[in-house]
Amino acid sequence: MQKKIFGSLLIIFLGLKALGQTTGAENLGLVNWIDIKTAQELNKTNPKPILIDVYTDWCGWCKHMMKTTFSDQGLANYINTYFYPVRFNAETKDTVEFQEKKYANKNTGNRSPNDLAVI
C-alpha cells in the first residue's frame, strides 16, 4: 500500500515539475544580438565597437545577466545604439573568423573552449 502511495506521489510530483519547466526558449533580454560575421559586415559601412558577450550553456551567471542586466531597457537601448552586440558561445565547435584571423575549438576535452573565448 505504501509503495502505491509513494509511486503515485512520485508520478504527480514529476508531472508537476515537467509542467513548470520552460519550453526551452532562452531569454535573450532586450539587446538585439547578432552573429559575429554580421557585426563585422555592418562595421565596414557604419563603424561601431563590437561588444562580445561570451557565454556557455551551463553558466548560471550568464543566464542571470541575461535576465537582469541585458533585460534593463536603458542599458539595452545604449548597447543597441552604440555597439554591435554579439553573443558568443565559448564552447562552439565552429571555426570563427574575427578581424581576419580564424579561431577554432581544439577539442581538448570536456567543455573545451573556442580560441576566441580564450584571447
Listing of model-derived features with the role each one plays in the protein:
Residues 31-50, 79:
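A short beta-strand-turn-helix
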